[in-house]
Amino acid sequence: MYPLLFRTVLSRMDPEDAHHLASTAIALLPSSGFGWIARRLTAPDPSLAVDALGLRFPSPFGVAAGFDKDAQAVLGLGQLGFGHVEVGTVTAEAQPGNPRPRLFRLIEDRAVINRMGFNNGGAAALADRLRRLRSRRDRPVIGVNIGKTRAVAVDDAVADYVRSARLVAPVADYLAVNVSSPNTPGLRGLQEIELLRPLLTSIRDAADGVPVLVKIAPDLQDAEVERIAELATELGLAGVIATNTTLSRADLRTDAAVVEAAGAGGLSGSPLAPRALEVLRILRRALPAESCVISVGGVETAEDVQARLDAGATLVQGYTAFLYRGPLWARSVNAGLVRIRRTR
C-alpha cells in the first residue's frame, strides 16, 4: 500500500512538505488511539535487545539524526518499532537553516540530497521537551545530536557546543557530536585532530558522565578515520557514529542534469552503503572491543542491518529509506532480523 501512496501522492509533493506531513502523523500516533495497536504490531522481538552505552536498546535498529530534529515524534517513532531515536541536529541557538528548496529526492538511486543547514528550535527548547519525556516508560532510547550554530565562528565553536551539551546532556541517554555535516560552513574542518581534541574534551567534560560519541563523514581518508578512532579512545569517548552524508556524486543512476539541478548538499541513501561499510570496518579494527560503533548510511533492509552488525557495528541507524519504505519499515527490519538469525 505504501509504495502506491508514495508513487501517486508523496513523490509529487515537495520533499520537505511530505516529510512534515509524515512526521506530524507519527507525532500524533501516541494520542490517536492507534498507538497501542502500533506498538503491539511493531514491538521488536525480545531476542533483538542490545546492551550498549549502559543502556538496553530493544532493537539494534534506530532512527538517525535529521528525521526528528526537535524531538516532536519520539514516542511515535518508538511505537513504530525503532529501538532508539537520535534527535537533532540541535544547536545552542534556534535557527531557520538554509533557504528552501533544500531537500531533493533521487528516486532512481533511492537517495536524497539535502542542504537543510541545521534548522531547529534550539537546545533549550529541545531540553524542555525531552525533560517531559524522561519519565515515560514507553519511550525509546533517546540520543541527542549537537552541532555548531551557523552564526558562531569556528574559533568559538567549543563554547557553542559546550552550551548545547550542558543544556541537553541531563535529559539525553547519549550525545552525538556532529562535526561532519557538509551544510554548515567550516564544520567539517573540525574533524582535524588539532581542532577536534579540545572540542571533544570540552564536550565530554560538560556531558558529566553521559556517553559521548562523535559522528564523522564518509569523505575522510582512511588514515583520518583511524586517527579519529585513536583520539576517541584516548579521550575515553563512548564511541563513533559513521557516517554522515557524502559530497560525492559518483556512480549515480539518476540523470546527471537532475543531480546538477539539485545543487550542493549531502547525499544519503543507497549509494552511500559501500563507503559506510568500509568506514565501519576501519573503525572496528581501530577501536577497542568495548567501544560503541553506530553504523549509518545506505541501510534499507534487514539484510543490510545484519551485514553491519556482522561487520562489527554495535547499533545501526537509518533515515533515507524511511521515505521510500514507509511507516512499517522498522517492523519489517526487525522481523527480518529475527528470520535471519533463526536460519543461522
From Swiss-Prot:
The keyword Oxidoreductase applies. InterPro entries: Aldolase_TIM, DHO_dehydrogenase, Dihydroorotate_DH_1_2, Dihydroorotate_DH_2, Dihydroorotate_DH_cat, Dihydroorotate_DH_CS. It is found in: Cell membrane. Its main location: membrane. SUPFAM superfamilies: FMN-linked oxidoreductases. It is an enzyme of class 1 (oxidoreductase). Signal peptide: none annotated. The active site is at S181. PANTHER family: DIHYDROOROTATE DEHYDROGENASE (QUINONE), MITOCHONDRIAL (PTHR48109:SF4), DIHYDROOROTATE DEHYDROGENASE (QUINONE), MITOCHONDRIAL-RELATED (PTHR48109). Catalyzes the conversion of dihydroorotate to orotate with quinone as electron acceptor. Monomer. This is Dihydroorotate dehydrogenase (quinone). It comes from Clavibacter michiganensis subsp. michiganensis (strain NCPPB 382). The gene is pyrD.
